[in-house]
Amino acid sequence: SLYRFQIDSNIYQMSTEEYELHLRCFKQEIIQYNPFFNHFSRVGSIMPKENFISQNFDSKEFTLFDDEPIYHSHLTKSILPEGNYAIRYCKSFEEEIKLLPQFLLDIREQGYQIIGDYLCEVIHEQPSLEEQKRDMFIRMQVRIGKKVKNFNLNHFRN
C-alpha cells in the first residue's frame, strides 16, 4: 500500500533541514492516530506523470510504502498499480535530480511510454545533519507501457 501525504513545498527544492522538518511532520501525523506504528521506513515522494513527462520536477506529496493499516484523515491510501516499471537507483536527492532527464530519455529511447506517476522510494537513509548530507539508496521508478507502433491505414485500403 501507498500512504500519500500532501505538503505545501516542492520536495526537490528543499534544503536538508526543510526536508527533515517535513519528514518529521509526516511521521508525527501518522503516530498521532496510530501510536503503535513503528515501521516508518521506505518513505518517498510521488511526482505526477505530467510533471515528469514535461520535466517539471515538482513533487508536493510524501508517500510511505507499507502494508500495515494506517488510519488518518489526511492520508490517502492507494495501491501501487501492477505492471511494468522502469527502475533506476541513485545515492542522493541531488543525484536523482541530475538523473531524472536522462531517465526519461532512456525510457523513450527504449520505445516505452510513461503511463503512471513517477515514484521516488528511499530504501535506505541515514541522516548526517553535521555534514549536511544523507547516506541514501533511492529507487527511481515509473510505470511504463510499450509504445504502439504507427501503422499506415492506407496499407489496408484497396
Where are each of the predicted segments found?
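A solvent-exposed interaction/effector surface
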Residues: S1-N158
